[in-house]
């Protein structure tokens, strides 16, 4: 009979072999996973800045925001980056004057629009700009917090600080290539540079490709109100615009209509929420300009 010391030694050696085999399996699995997501694992990060507008707030809130401090997403506590700039301007309201038949601008006492610029390490994943795990989009809502403050705002600018990103190269699967226009209402001037020729636009809810931007143009934005005589008056809003985006994309013709890759029917007058690498907002299908067989 073998003594207990020899038996224990054999068991220990056997355990070591099992552990080494298990580690080898785990290591192989990790290696395969890294290879399958190589584009993500080998990404190069670079400093990216974006500005969040916190509209119509008391100036005391701005005093709580200090350059150099960390800022977080208030919904889940995710780190967003560091504050590199804080500025505020008087909040401007607009009111329609029936007697004059136009909108007038006025400053709201003791209320300000605060612009907080955040810097973090970002990268391009082929679809979105990711900054510290957050994907900022111009017009996209952002819930922020820091020491002594928390508020909801909207991203109004993204600065890649000289970095370059490639255009998307996805194509749709429809048999028709269509040219159509989406209109975005009530766009302030600071937001107009977020969509560029060559950008790929997606439907936000489904991530299906809508098309590639062919052209972007603007017109003054206005609203219809009742004048002093009770008649309808159309009046422009100063520094506010309609933004029109012409897209070329694939779709499928069915017996009851034209359908995009997402399954959404393209109907002039229907709304759609879109997203791109810089931008996210709800718009309206404005025009279907033409279509031809896809090549």
Where are these regions (language model features)?
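Beta-strand/loop-dominated core regions that host nucleotide or nucleotide-derived cofactor-binding catalytic loops
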Residues: 2-295
